[in-house]
Amino acid sequence: MNTENIDENLKNDENSIPNINELEITNSNDRNTFEQKCLYPALKLIYSGIMGSSNQPIIVGSTALYLQGIYYDKFPNDIDVCILNKSDIFKYTIAFGRMCKKYGFNVDFITYDTQNTDETSYTKININDITILAAFKERCIDFLQSFRDFYIEKNNSKRAQKYAEKLIYLQEHYPELFNVSDE
C-alpha cells in the first residue's frame, strides 16, 4: 500500500485548527439537533467499547476538541478521552488536555511530536493516522458523516467536511484498513 498518498490526504493545515468559540452553538434548537445527530452517537461509540492501546475509549482529533470543549459536563468522570493529533499542528492540544484534567478526565496525548520533552502530559508513542483510523473501522463513519452534514448545514463548515472526508476517503480507497479484528 502506498502510504505517502494517504498521509498527504490526512495533512492538516493552520486553517483547520479548531476554534471552540467559533463552533459553540447558542440556539437551543440547534443544540438539541446537535445532541441528537452528533453528541449521542459519539457517546454511543464510547460506551460500545472502542478502545485504544492504553485501554481507553477514543475520540479523535478535532471531534474530541469540539465535543469536550462544549459538552465536557455530558461525559461522566470515569470516561477517559484519548486525543490523537499532530501536536505541532493542533496548538490547542496541550491547553485542551489541561482543561480535561481540570474537570476530572484522564488524558493521554499520542502524538508525532517528540520535541516537547518538557511537557509531562505527553505520552511519547510513535503512531500514525492509519492505525488510528483503523481502530475506529466503519463504526466511526456514520458519526463523522453526521458531524460533517450538520455543520455544512448550520455553519457551511469546510473544517467539518474536510475532517470527515479524511475517513470517508480511506474507507472508499483502502477498505482493508477497516477490516480490523475486534479481538
Go through the PLM ranges and name each one.
Residues 2-59:
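Helical scaffold of the NTase/Pol beta-like nucleotidyltransferase catalytic core
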Residues 7, 13, 17-29, 116-183:
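Catalytic cores of NTP-dependent nucleotidyl/adenyl transfer enzymes across multiple folds
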Residues 29-43, 82-120:
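Metal-dependent nucleotidyltransferase catalytic core
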Residues 44-79, 84-89:
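Active-site nucleotide-donor binding segment shared across nucleotidyl transfer reactions
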Residues 47-51, 97-100, 171:
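N-terminal cationic-hydrophobic initiation segments that often serve targeting/anchoring roles
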Residues 59, 81, 109, 132-134:
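Generic preference for hydrophobic
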Residues 62-64, 112-114, 137-139:
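Residues that form or immediately flank small-molecule/cofactor binding pockets and catalytic motifs
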